[in-house]
Every structure is written in C-alpha cells, then in structure tokens.
C-alpha cells in the first residue's frame, strides 16, 4: 500500500488528452471519457486530502492445464479476468474506508472504477514505476497486480514516490506485442492492442484477426515477456481459485444463451452487456485454432454464417475462410 496527496494528477491528465488527440485511445471511454474528472480526486470526494492506494496480486501459484486438442477449440483468457480479481480488493478497501469514517472523515473506496486513474495515483504514491508496456511495475514483484484506491478527507503522510525506473534498456515487452501496439516506451496505441480490440464493439479489423490467435478476452504477452514480472512475480502468487476460467470452450459459448454467458463471465467488461461481441471473438478463435475436420466446428460456423446479426455472420464467414486456408495452405481466403 501507499499514500499520496489528493492533488490533481497533472501528468496523467496531459497524457490522456494528448493520446486522445492523437487517436491512440481507440475510441475507448473509461478514464479517457472525462480526463478532468478522472485525474482529480476532489471530483470524486469533495475536500479530499489523501489517497490510499493498494495493489493485490493475481498471479496464481498453479496454472490451469491447457485443454487437450481433442477437447475442441478453446479460447484463452487474460490472467486478470480468470475470476473477478477486483472483488476481494474492493471488499478490503471498503473495510479500511469504513474504519476511516468512524473517525469522522469521509472515505470512499474505488476499484476498477473510472472515477480515478488508479495507476497514476499508485505511481505517485511510490508503489512502482511505469514499464515500457505502460503497466505499473512494483519493485521486486512486477506487474501482476490489480489496483484500487481510497479517497479520503483524512490527511496522512505521503509515502515516498515515484519509484525509480527499473526497466533500463530492456525492450522485451515492445518486441513481444503481437500487433506492435507499444508505439513508444509507455505509450499504447489502443487501436492495435488486442486487449482493447477484443472489448471494442464493431467488426474486428482484418489485419488483427490472425494475431488474436486463441484469445477471447485479454492479452498477457507484454507481461509474460517482462523479465521482472516473470522472475519476481512468483514471490507474490495467490492460490488458484476453483472458479478460475483460464480457458473457454468456444463451441459451448457459441451454443449458449446470453444469460448463461452472463452468469459465467459476467465479470468481463462487455459493452452494454451485448454478448454478440464475445461470440464474435469466439468465431475468430475457432477460425484460428479450430480443427477444420471437426464436425462440431463446421456445424457452428455454418450456423453463424446464416446468422441474422451481420457482424456475427461476417466473422463466421471469415472463420470459414481461415479454416480453409489452414487446411489447404496457399488457398485464397
């Protein structure tokens, strides 16, 4: 944990405006929607004096087994979304906030909330430094953490910060990005970032569909490549939650109704809870990793090629062409 003042996050505000002006936001909302608000703790809690920041690890001590090939096409989920990693952090922060309120101060907990740029307050509080992949890296631990804050009218002594840079000349995360989304150290072009592409509504640009590979939600490549996160992250592992979904049966998902998807993957961010976007992603995954000879694959693709939703029909047609291309390398797609 760390503590910082409730002053405006000037550098973060400038970065949000600059990147939005350059179109690097990729049309996302979140903290980009209103930078003046998301970079000013006083807009979240009037008369705030301090921000308490906490980081909770989500790297597991044991990784789930990769599904066997005969299990059918499975889609990969980013680590932070295997379960709702923010729920236990939110509970802990609210408990601390409650204790602060008992001393007649205002205190509000925020986690996975657009009210404040958590990464920026964590940086100023000295929890870590910005990696070239734009993640916050904690000294001796890496980036496998989710962040949350308490904004309060109580005044606490700030912890020393920011932490000194620990990346040096390393560019492994930049080299590892499958779409070249890290356009400069610490600068992400969200238009190319697979994590955002898989959340963004609309048709997935053709040039990124093959690069998506077997991913349905999230992408960990820039973190998996980070030597600090890989080497030191295991010091801060948690037990694997029995509810963890690291892999999704793509055909099962495509056959399922919305309420089933919502019940199982409701902690995912899905625009307007329109699960067509999750199905769209699953179709791309099947095109990339499905067995062209599997009758279950052929059935679900043909079903979606005739779908009333033009987005799903178009992605199913692409998947069919991709399966044909993989089955007969060199064939026209």
Segments the model singles out, each with a brief description of its role:
Residues 1-6, 47, 310-315, 319-333:
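Long C-terminal interaction/binding lobes of large macromolecular proteins
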Residues 1-166:
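Auxiliary alpha/beta "docking" domains used to position bulky ligands
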Residues 172-195, 215-239, 300:
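Iron-sulfur cluster-binding cysteine motifs and their immediate structural context
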Residues 199, 269-274, 303-312, 333:
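Short coil turns that connect the paired helices of HEAT/ARM alpha-solenoid repeats
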Residues 243-276, 283:
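Alpha-helical adaptor scaffolds
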Residues 260-264, 293-305, 325-333:
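Amphipathic alpha-helical scaffolding segments comprising HEAT/armadillo-like alpha-solenoid repeats
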Residues 278, 297, 310-313:
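Positions within the helices of HEAT/ARM-like alpha-solenoid repeats
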Residues 279-292, 314-326:
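Structural detector for internal amphipathic alpha-helices that build alpha-solenoid repeat scaffolds
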